[in-house]
Amino acid sequence: MKMADAKQKRNEQLKRWIGSETDLEPPLLKKKKTKVKFDDGAVFLAACSSGDTEEVLRMLDRGADINYANVDGLTALHQACIDDNVDMVTFLVEHGACINQPDNEGWIPLHAAASCGYLDIAEYLISQGASVGVVNSEGETPLDIAEEEAMEELLQNEINRQGVDIEAARKEEERIMLRDARQWLNSGQINDVRHTKSGGTALHVAAAKGYAEVLKLLIQAGYDVNIKDYDGWTPLHAAAHWGKEEACRILVEHLCDMDVVNKVGQTAFDVADEDILGYLEELQKKQNLLLSEKKDVKKSPLIETTTTGDNNQSVKPLKSKETLLLEPEKTAPRIETLEPEKVDEEEGEGKKDESSCSSEEEEEEDSESENEADKTKSSVPSSVSNSTPTTAPSSITVTSPTTPSNQVTTPTSPTKKVSTPAGKLSPKEEDRKDESPASWRLGLRKTGSYGALAEISTTKEAQKEKDTAGVMRSASSPRLSSSLDNKDKEKEKEKTRLAYVAPTIPRRHVSTSDIDEKENRDSAASLVRSGSYTRRRWEEDLKNSDGTASTNRTSSYQRSTSHTLALGRTSSSRDLPAKSSSASSLEPNNSKAWQPSSYYQSYSIHRSGSFGRRHEDPLSSTSSSTTTTTTTSSVTSPTGHRSLLSRYWAEESAEKEKEKEKESATVIPTINTAGTTTTTSTTGTVLGSDGRERRRSYLTPVRDEESESQRKARSRQARQSRRSTQGVTLTDLQEAEKTIGRSRPTRPREDEKEEKEKQDKEKQEEKKETETKEDDYRSRYRSFEEKYRTSLASSTTASSTIPSSSSSSSSSLYSTSSLNRPNSLTGLTSTYSRSTRDTDRESDRKEKDEDRDGDDKSQPRSIRDRRRPREKRRSTGVSFWTQDSDENEPDHPSDSEGSTKGEPQSDRLSSNDPLSTSTSSTDRYESLSSRGIGESRRPYSRFEKDDSTDYKKLYEQILAENEKLKAQLRDTELELSDLKLQLEKATQRQERFADRSQLEMEKRERRALERKISEMEEELKMLPDLKADNQRLKDENGALIRVISKLSK
């Protein structure tokens, strides 16, 4: 039964098979042998690459080309150099391979060897005559692309040995093209050969590489500006693709079709570099305007006949053949003239652009043709310098003389021979033609170069003479405006022309001779442009100039292109020692008085540039005329004048001290040590530590709290109305402590509180005036005082001499609450004066000393009496310091006691830092110890009848307390260093933890990647199995087909 079913199914299959596609196929498959035929050159390259020299020899015998290049232009020698196959390189060179064969990018085999760093191959190639000065398409020599030092050294030595000029090598192609273009122009016939692969012409190459001069000559020789290569690219496509703005401009000027498409439908805009797209759109607008205006004008297809010889003629680049024929003769003298210029330009600009030379030559030739036209005119002097400018500062008004009608220049067509050959030119004309480019090129340089202003000064007289004969066109005005902007034709009727400034003018050198022209031309408007580099020289000229030069210089309104310099501004007061207008008039070197024409400059002199603004801003905003005048004179006055001036200020401020306390402080400038920077005490900017130290040392505090001299006078008045033994009550002391405690946060109101406090004390003291004290207590008090003085006499003499001498010789102006003076200077009295909390007790103590000195005439005067009051001190040439400066510097409070000691500035500066120096530390302990002394003195100052006070013991206690405090300080310093160490360890630990976490993250990522790799490896292992399964299925399928075909038979 099963067999029957199987047969039935099989029969059904066979029925379906009949007539199927497989059944219609022949039973025997036609087996065609597939043959791949390679090009002989490709086989040759493969044989060379495999190193099979025998096969290479056989192929060479059969006629294979040893210099065959693949699609990239690589030859077998290139490939052998890349593969580092020295044997094959030697073999190929010996059998005649071209050693300097370039590939599509211009690389020769030496480029390849230098790039890969194969020193032995490079040495061999050089020994066989490989050129070290060959440049590739990007202008790079083998030295430029060498990376290893040994290779660079080898190539550099070879360059030096052969004397190769690299710059000349870079411009070799342009020079050859220029020579050929001139030859074609002279012969009137173009012998150009298209590139075998791309179909590119000389015009394509010149446009792509930006050879502007070659481009012009080729167009004049009769090249079609819309010529296409094999891909349909025009020269405009090439120039736009490689971003050559100058080439684009020249092609557009000559009315090339900007909408031509290549074989893939792209216009020049589609293939253009994105940086040049905007410029191309602008050129298209100009071309459309030009075409619309020239529709009805009948013109020659190549050279337009100009009706005027004006130097602003409409189409300048279209030169006559006569001018171009003369260029070979002019080349030699021009090159000689340009040699120093090239050196300067290389210094200023570094590596120049390839096309900079050609753009300079283009400027040259234009100027030549213009100057020729000018010299053939009647000598009508230009009235430019006398004309009144009415235009905006950006435009320059130029009036040009009219050319007589009988002197119209009509250039010949380029296809004809020139009627006047170069040899027949008169020597006078040759001289003139050589003169004009040299003088033009003399000024052709960037304004920012270092030597620009020197050039201006040397050529200024020559330029003035030239301006009377004719006006040269500015190098900075773009060519496009002169040829495409035909609105100029209307302006030519009025004999004026405004220079159009294009947004981007590439590779143009701004001529400094034009700056001279503008300076002479616009002397009425007095417009001078200067670069940021040349400003310093101008300032030196201003400084050293005589009266006449300074007058001329000042009447001109200076205009600068630098960011930091503005109209009539000085760059920075550091760089310009005395450049203000009033400064020049006050200098002793300047013999002539300043002219009235300097008004605008002196008006704007206080407006500094961005760098000098900090010091000069307060001056410009000063309301007081006296302050401004003093500022200007203090900037420039010499040292003697400065000391005299500061003395005057010291006397004046002493007289007006009381008025200044009530009024808001006027800004009084202080003279800096250099004498160049004018700073005010209210300047908000934070100076450095040196500046702060300098300023503090020169400022005299007018009145912060009550001055020492005023306090002395007040205490004398109080002593006249009461006895010296009269005490101060406990309530007085408590009130004084409260007042001083409150005065800490409220420093500006401390003066008023102290005055009230003193008045209250005087009233109380007058009430107690009637009270009598026992005479025996007074005598006892004096005896104790004398005992104390004798016990401390030895220590006092040693320590008091130095401070007293230093106090008379130095005048430090800031006083701090902790002064570095010994305890025994004036006994315990000076200890009291160190603490501002004990000011009342200190004044009381001084009064008692005064009475005691009055009774005992034999006692020497105390150091306090030897000090001069502030008003009687002699001025040291420093101006007084106002109250505002103390408010601006709350870090350094000036206490009531003036600093009479010769304390160094560093000590004063560091007095706020308890750990800075040991002297400041001891000052802190002495000020702290004064509290303990105050507490121990309080019962005695209330005149209780306690005669058991032992001053020596007190002194020893104070010393012991000081030692304890010093020990505590050492302990705290040690603790601080320990804490710092712990902090550093903690930070290092944190960093380590961070590093660890980072490492863990990396490890995790690595594990994940490794897992992925292992999974992929597993899949790769499965791949052969899958392939085997696939093959098996294919085989089974083939077997089934064969079985079916057999069964069908």
Swiss-Prot record:
Record-linked CDD domains: IPD_MYPT1
Biased composition (Low complexity): 378-421, 473-484, 571-592, 620-639, 665-686, 790-819
Chain positions of ANK repeats: 39-68, 72-101, 105-134, 138-164, 198-227, 231-260
Ranges of Basic and acidic residues composition bias in the record: 319-341, 426-436, 485-497, 649-664, 702-711, 747-789, 835-863, 890-906, 934-947
Cellular compartments annotated: Cytoplasm
Molecular functions (GO terms): 14-3-3 protein binding; enzyme inhibitor activity; myosin phosphatase regulator activity; phosphatase regulator activity; protein heterodimerization activity; protein kinase binding
Annotated segments matching region Disordered: 302-947
GO CC entries: A band; cytoplasm; PTW/PP1 phosphatase complex; Z disc
One GO term (biological process): signal transduction
Sequence ranges of Acidic residues compositional bias: 359-371
Transmembrane segments: none
UniProt keywords, alphabetically: ANK repeat, Cytoplasm, Repeat
InterPro entries: Ankyrin_rpt, Ankyrin_rpt-contain_sf, MYPT1/MYPT2/Mbs85, PP1_Regulatory_Subunit, PRKG1_interact
Residue stretches of biased makeup (Polar residues): 303-315, 545-564, 593-607, 820-829
Entries under SMART domains matching the protein: ANK
SUPFAM superfamilies: Ankyrin repeat (SSF48403)
General function of this protein: Regulates myosin phosphatase activity.
Subunit structure: PP1 comprises a catalytic subunit, and one or several targeting or regulatory subunits. Ppp1r12a mediates binding to myosin.
The protein, known as: Protein phosphatase 1 regulatory subunit 12A
Organism encoding this protein: Danio rerio (Zebrafish)
Lineage start: Eukaryota, Metazoa, Chordata, Craniata, Vertebrata
